Amino acid sequence: TLGPIIHNPQVVSRLEGLGIRSADRVEDIPAGARAVIRSHGVSRATADALTRRGCEVIDATCPFVARIHAMAREASEAGRALIVVGEANHPEIQGILGWTNGEKYAVLTEEDVERLPHMAQATIVSQTTMVESKFRELCAMIEKKVAAPDIHATICPATRDRQKACTDIAAKADVMIVIGGRDSSNSRKLYQLAAAICPRTY
């Protein structure tokens, strides 16, 4: 797999015992090997590099992420800038940004938005694990920077439902425990949402 297939060290270790290894770079995957693209997706350049190595590619990119890749391509072809609301260093965001040849930006804070140049038009999308209220808040600021913004709330519906359930439970609970991988964006967002309501969140 190109990168850990899941944010769960125990599962990754078990898969390694079955001969399924994780590689951080395309160069670390043997030429002609079977290569799995995980749900985060990859950039066009990375996908092309796997093909050039003669790999048998199994594309497990999440359909919601693949849809954002298509939006990035469309923005590029139309000459529009692409703004992704999310964590710039997250593999999902890096993959999305790699599907446009035009201007591209990743923003996560108000300061990030303030640094954006003024532009005539842009396509705005979100990381699939983004908190919707935060996305809307930043989009309101982005609209002051972009004359003709094309906004798409590309948050995964399952993620949105989990976040709502988390805040509903946190409002009634004395203690909240979020069970998930420390490297998981989903787990971090659930923790942050719960902690803002229930101080005893772990």
Describe each region flagged by the PLM:
Residues 1-202:
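The feature marks the mature, well-folded catalytic cores of soluble enzymes
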